[in-house]
Amino acid sequence: PMSDFAYPLHEECGVFGIYDRAGTEDVAAAAYSALYALQHRGQESCGIAVNDDGVIQGHRDLGLVNEVFTPAVLGSLSTPTAHMATGHVRYATAGSRVRANAQPMIVRHGRGTMALCHNGNLTNALELRRQLENEGAIFHGSSDTEVICYLITRNRLRMGSIETAISKTMDVLEGAYSLVIMSATKLIAVRDPRGYRPLCIGTLPGGGYVFASESCALDAAGATLLRDVEPGEIVIADTKTGELRSIKDHCGRPDTQMCVFEFIYFSRPDSIIEGSSVHEARKQ
């Protein structure tokens, strides 16, 4: 029902992405470990999508990480040729406890496939959704994440790259969003211009990058914290070059403000956010 959509109180979700440049990691297992470390950010549903040589497939369901990802399910996602993965844990109101709202959301379109994970809350989601529905869009769930997916996909069909499509989409999004997006050849982290929800970058010992809501997930995946994604920044790990690059068209807003509850309540004490230990911040 629309009422669920109008008040999607999934403030506290966890997102994760991994690109293993060396090809030595079991990326599905790394995603599982990371989501287990982020379980405190959402207990309603979870999911993992893997990129196996450009082919994206995934599994998502209602339940805790260790319930949804049995050894058999995790095994079906673990292949030696999969070098990228994304994962998500979701927290939401009871009314929208449906599998259609579980993430990562996988979208197949004329230019390829995209898997998207979202932590945050759009303030203009209802307005955007109605606008899209009036133009013929069909939605399967009640989450604002689906609106983001639709907008990026529509822009991608008109534009030269997924990152330009994301930047164009950011022009109309209002509110909080930290995104991890996986295409056939790229893993991308996006943070809203106000930086309301945390998002950090880590490096893998064998080469490659990890994106996560909190640094505790980097630790779980065997990565080292590099830095936070800046408010408004789009960070691209490109498998064709193996390097990180950044688009800062939406950076530089003077009113950046991270949610105070990240330090007080949401985040794990052993995480480091914006250079500060959550544990130390709570003691203060």
What positions do the PLM features span?
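Conserved short alpha-helical segments that host acidic/polar catalytic motifs at enzyme active sites
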Residues: 1-284
